């Protein structure tokens, strides 16, 4: 029990607010030892401080911080708690204690500490940031959004808070309009703070509640009425110039059934205007501001919008008319004609497309010419620079190759331009703090294999993330590889080598790697375990592997949808996919098809083919994965999943803090069958 004065204050508390004359030098000495990595010396000096100045909060703070840096996370909170008792009115002491509790995974205790810190100092952005982080860990999205927003109000250039904020709001949906939220989401899409696909659902929600935009969009049952009103006044211009609407159309396939139908009707309106010689000649800035991005959206989603036979005939006639006009001289071509044709057919498919590049065009047209002519030309030119490392002979491999030559997947536009790079071992320790991870010999400069790199999102992100890494990215499809190489050059990524190869033949290269990643690939092989064994054979001792497999449980609606598609005889062609989508939506009204019709992949033709029409698909169970891991000298490090999912798992299985018990995860998945709809994504390490 503390002895109190008559005024109710503890003498030690007052002492904690006085800085002894000789203390600063000793505190600085502790800090210097920590900065130089002499943590044992720093701990002894900090202990000396607490012995010399037991009533001084800074001494206990230094000890707590040193203990935390040494990894003695359980010993750190008592020292920092002592600092709080000595100086309860200092926000920093509460924040330090919150940091210690957060390291221990005691998020509710950390939340209380950070809440006290911001109450004492409501203008300290870092405390708000940490409060937002623990709210996020606890699944309190609304409270996390409020905290991160406060950080950005106090310090708009706080990079970590920007990323945390958009990652948080990407999981939320709102009922009332917020200008801050709207403009921030528009910036995040335009500048690609995170993958645009992660923001499109939120963007559709925000458009629907924007009082200046939603009247233009109509409703699910009356989209046509809103379309007819589009040409009144400057409505087209207002929509086209709206930063969020514009950024979404130009960045990512639209993931919203109502908005997709509205855009489909808007495309028909564009066709009707362009087919009319009088309307086509009136290609004013307002029309181009709206219809130009709409045509870009059509290219991005691979022309997935449904189209009647009559409409396609009219579009084909307009395309033929455009080709004739170009042959007679590009100066006679109406900009709106180009935009309308580009909304139905890729411009590179026109035999006379080079002539279009010879003329100066308004921005709305020039952007389309870059997207649909110049960039595909660059990809064709890059094909000859991509080496072939192995033959492709397996029948299934050849069928999969053919699919991705026809439909490179995904057709992404933007990725975050820069990611803070980290050493691979540090990254894994941050991902899986409760797991014992063996030392990776070449962690400082790892050799990385991306087996099945697709159109480049995966290798580009890995090349940026893993510090001083050298990446080999292979795929079956030359169309995908040339897209990936163009995008990597566009982003200035220089540590990736792209090559064509079959995973089944990679063992013939006699190469080994510190990190191997193959996400969403092995389940498309004739036998996934065969390919998996090839990759394990190429992994160095203590090397790590990131994999992604479809879940048998989570894909149940996809399996049912594939049965329905086969029953109706829809072909894996552009027309077949366009016909199947409304049919599946109709079935979903009476027989839920779950994520099969709600996945973002449903809203792009190439992605929908990958989702529902793939030529080869296996699905695994956690029992199969566990058996392979045990039989092939691997150890399970953990799943990459949302904090809320991990929190729910810990609530269900508190005795597994590392979250590595796959039998527990199998129970969890049975109870929560959509947990792994995307995929099982996890990390492994190869044992000696």
Locations of regions flagged by a protein language model:
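Conserved SAM-binding loop of SAM-dependent methyltransferases across substrates and taxa
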Residues: 455-468
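Alpha-helical solenoid repeat scaffolds of the TPR/TPR-like class and their adjacent stem/linker regions
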Residues: 1-445, 460-463, 540
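Conserved SAM-binding strand-loop segment of SAM-dependent methyltransferases
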Residues: 492-504
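Conserved class I S-adenosyl-L-methionine
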Residues: 544-594
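Rossmann-like AdoMet/SAM-dependent catalytic core
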Residues: 187, 191, 210, 577-688
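A short glycine-rich, Lys/Arg-flanked "PGG" loop and its adjoining helix->strand segment in the class I
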Residues: 529-541
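A short acidic, Gly/Pro-enriched loop at the edge of an enzyme's catalytic core
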Residues: 506-516
């Amino acid at each position: 029990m503390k002895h109190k004065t008559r005024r109710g204050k503890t003498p030690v508390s007052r002492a904690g607010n006085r800085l002894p004359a000789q203390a600063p030098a000793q505190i600085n000495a502790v800090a210097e030892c920590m900065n130089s990595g002499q943590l044992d010396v720093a701990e002894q000096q900090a202990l000396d401080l607490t012995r010399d100045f037991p009533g001084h909060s800074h001494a206990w703070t230094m000890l707590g911080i040193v203990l935390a840096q040494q990894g003695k996370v359980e010993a750190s909170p008592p020292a920092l708690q002592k600092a709080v008792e000595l100086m309860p009115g200092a926000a920093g002491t509460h924040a330090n204690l919150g940091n210690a509790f957060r390291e221990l995974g005691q998020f509710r205790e950390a939340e209380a500490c950070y809440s006290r810190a911001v109450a004492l100092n409501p203008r300290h952005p870092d405390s708000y940031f940490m409060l937002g982080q623990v709210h996020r860990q606890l699944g309190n999205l609304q409270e996390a959004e409020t905290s991160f927003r406060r950080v950005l109000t106090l310090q708009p250039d706080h990079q970590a808070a920007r990323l945390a904020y958009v990652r948080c709001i990407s999981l939320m949906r709102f009922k009332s309009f917020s200008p801050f939220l709207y403009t921030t989401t528009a910036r995040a899409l335009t500048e690609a703070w995170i993958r645009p696909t992660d923001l499109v659902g939120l963007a559709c929600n925000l458009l629907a509640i924007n009082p200046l935009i939603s009247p233009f969009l109509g409703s699910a049952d009356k989209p046509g009425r809103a379309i007819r009103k589009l040409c009144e006044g400057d409505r087209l211009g207002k929509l086209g110039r709206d930063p969020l609407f514009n950024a979404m159309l130009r960045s990512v396939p639209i993931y919203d059934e109502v908005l997709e139908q509205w855009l489909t009707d808007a495309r028909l309106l564009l066709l009707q205007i362009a087919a009319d010689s009088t309307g086509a000649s009136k290609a004013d800035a307002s029309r181009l501001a709206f219809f130009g991005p709409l045509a870009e959206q059509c290219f991005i989603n691979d022309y997935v919008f449904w189209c009647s036979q009559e409409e396609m005939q009219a579009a084909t006639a307009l395309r033929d008319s455009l080709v004739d006009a170009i042959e007679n001289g590009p100066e006679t071509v109406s900009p709106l004609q180009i935009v309308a044709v580009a909304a139905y057919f890729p411009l590179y498919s026109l035999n006379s497309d080079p002539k279009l590049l010879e003329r100066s065009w308004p921005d709305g047209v020039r952007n389309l010419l870059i997207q649909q002519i110049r960039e595909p030309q660059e990809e064709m030119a890059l094909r000859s620079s991509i080496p072939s490392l192995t033959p492709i002979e397996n029948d299934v491999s050849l069928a999969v190759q053919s699919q991705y030559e026809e439909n490179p997947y995904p057709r992404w536009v933007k990725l975050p331009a820069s990611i803070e790079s980290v050493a691979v071992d540090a990254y894994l320790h941050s991902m899986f703090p409760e797991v014992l991870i063996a030392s990776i010999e070449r962690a400082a400069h790892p050799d990385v294999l991306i087996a099945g790199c697709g159109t480049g999102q995966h290798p580009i992100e890995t090349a940026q993330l893993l510090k001083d890494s050298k990446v080999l990215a292979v795929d079956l499809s030359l169309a995908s590889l040339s897209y990936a190489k163009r995008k990597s050059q566009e982003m200035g990524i220089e540590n990736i080598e792209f090559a064509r190869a079959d995973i089944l033949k990679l063992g013939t290269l006699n190469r080994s790697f510190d990190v191997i990643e193959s996400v969403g690939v092995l389940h498309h092989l004739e036998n996934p375990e065969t390919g998996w064994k090839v990759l394990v054979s190429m992994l160095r001792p203590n090397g790590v592997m990131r994999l992604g497999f479809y879940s048998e449980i989570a894909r149940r609606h996809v399996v049912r949808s594939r049965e329905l598609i086969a029953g109706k005889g829809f072909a894996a062609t552009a027309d077949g996919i366009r016909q199947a989508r409304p049919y599946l939506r109709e079935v979903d009204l009476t027989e839920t098809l779950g994520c099969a019709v709600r996945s973002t992949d449903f809203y792009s033709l190439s992605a929908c083919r990958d989702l529902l029409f793939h030529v080869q698909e296996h699905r695994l169970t956690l029992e199969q994965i566990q058996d392979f891991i045990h039989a092939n000298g691997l150890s399970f490090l953990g799943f990459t999943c949302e904090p809320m999912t991990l929190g729910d798992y810990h609530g269900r299985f508190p005795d597994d803090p590392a979250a590595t018990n796959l039998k527990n995860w199998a129970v969890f998945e049975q109870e929560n069958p959509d947990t792994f709809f995307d995929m099982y994504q996890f990390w492994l390490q190869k044992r000696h």
